[in-house]
Amino acid sequence: MNWRVVDSVVSTDTNSVFTLISSQQSFKLILWYKATFYLSSGDTLSINGASITVNNHPVELTLYRTTVYNARFWQTIVNSNTHCAGNHRQSVGRCGYRRKCKLLYCPFQKH
């Protein structure tokens, strides 16, 4: 099945990412996965059994949970992760939260 990434929110406290995806039929899911990969808005995601491709490239995601989209739950996720500037689409030159952040790789800074 093919999906489009609507939005992603990094959880700096848990080294994970929450991503909202939508199917061509407008069915929406929330993915919770380990932050070894970051899905950006507009990415295309294809799931076929155990294989996952992003923008036609195979990737390995450690999925913790998948749940049906609920607007209130999604807003709770967004509102609970406000200390990461990248979650607000702000330019991140130097992260002020880095000492407390549990992410091993920041998707918002150049490396």
Curated annotation (Swiss-Prot):
Cellular component, GO, one term: cytoplasm
Subcellular location: Cytoplasm
Species this chain originates from: Cronobacter sakazakii (strain ATCC BAA-894)
TM segment ranges: none
Function per UniProt: Involved in the stabilization of the sigma stress factor RpoS.
Family, per entry: Belongs to the IraM/RssC family.
Cited Gene3D superfamilies: 2.40.50.650
GO biological process, one term: cellular response to starvation
Source species, domain of life: Bacteria
HAMAP family registered for this protein in UniProt: Anti_adapt_IraM
UniProt-listed InterPro entries: Anti-adapter_IraM (IPR014448), PmrD_sf (IPR038679)
UniProt keywords, alphabetically: Cytoplasm, Stress response
The protein's name: Anti-adapter protein IraM
Coiled coil: none
